[in-house]
């Protein structure tokens, strides 16, 4: 099963959607983002958030395998560009090597003083033959009829074993920092990302509570304003 949920430019006005769209059972975006999938005997939640006061994203995977032993492959898509800009293969040139915290480290040719560091709680790295995901298309551009195609660098797959009739939790952290500070991440525990994401969700929930989010009086005030 391919649980990638994205779309790429096709011929004419018809985008090519990946197989993951078929297995997506739920999606939420409420301060943090969560994708839920069901495929065969596998159930998976992918939960992610930008950490507060830190140039770091946390991704938590919770996978339930209700069948025989299975394998899982995660392909991190990496990019380095200005916000709202697009990128091509020629823009994504990196020095890339495995690191000591379960992931890999990238130094962009466009900014050699910076380092992109990925850490993972488990799994093994496997180099990919095809290292670029080309012409990814975002729905915002489709809706606005603009040609915002993007490309990502994907040098490695992370592979995991899912024991039969088991539940597995995986944490990924990715951050950007000056090269001289390398490394800044430690290898996370299986639940590290979930804990960090919960802190972010608590923060957004507190903002809503303070603002009276969901209160008719608050909504009326916004309308008047």
Protein language model features and the residues they cover:
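Hydrophobic beta-strand positions in extracellular immunoglobulin-like domains
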Residues: 48, 62-63, 174
């Amino acid at each position: 099963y391919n649980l990638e949920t994205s779309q790429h430019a096709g011929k004419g006005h018809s985008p090519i959607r990946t197989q993951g769209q078929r297995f997506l059972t739920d999606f939420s975006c409420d301060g943090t983002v969560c994708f839920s999938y069901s495929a065969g005997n596998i159930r998976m939640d992918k939960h992610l958030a930008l950490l507060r006061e830190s140039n770091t994203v946390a991704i938590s995977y919770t996978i339930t395998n209700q069948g025989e032993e299975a394998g899982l492959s995660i392909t991190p898509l990496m990019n380095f560009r200005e916000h709202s800009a697009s990128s091509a293969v020629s823009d994504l040139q990196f020095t890339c090597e495995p690191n000591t915290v379960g992931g890999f480290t990238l130094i962009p040719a466009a900014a050699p003083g910076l380092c992109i560091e990925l850490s993972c709680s488990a799994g093994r790295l496997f180099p990919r033959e095809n290292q670029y995901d080309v012409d990814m298309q975002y729905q915002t551009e489709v809706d606005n009829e603009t040609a915002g195609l993007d490309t990502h660098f994907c040098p490695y797959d992370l592979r995991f074993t899912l024991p039969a009739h088991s539940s597995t939790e995986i944490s990924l952290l990715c951050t950007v920092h000056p090269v001289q500070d390398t490394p800044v991440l430690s290898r996370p525990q299986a639940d590290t990302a979930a804990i960090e994401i919960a802190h972010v969700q608590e923060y957004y929930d507190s903002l809503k509570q303070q603002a009276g989010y969901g209160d008719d009086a608050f909504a009326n005030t916004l309308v008047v304003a």
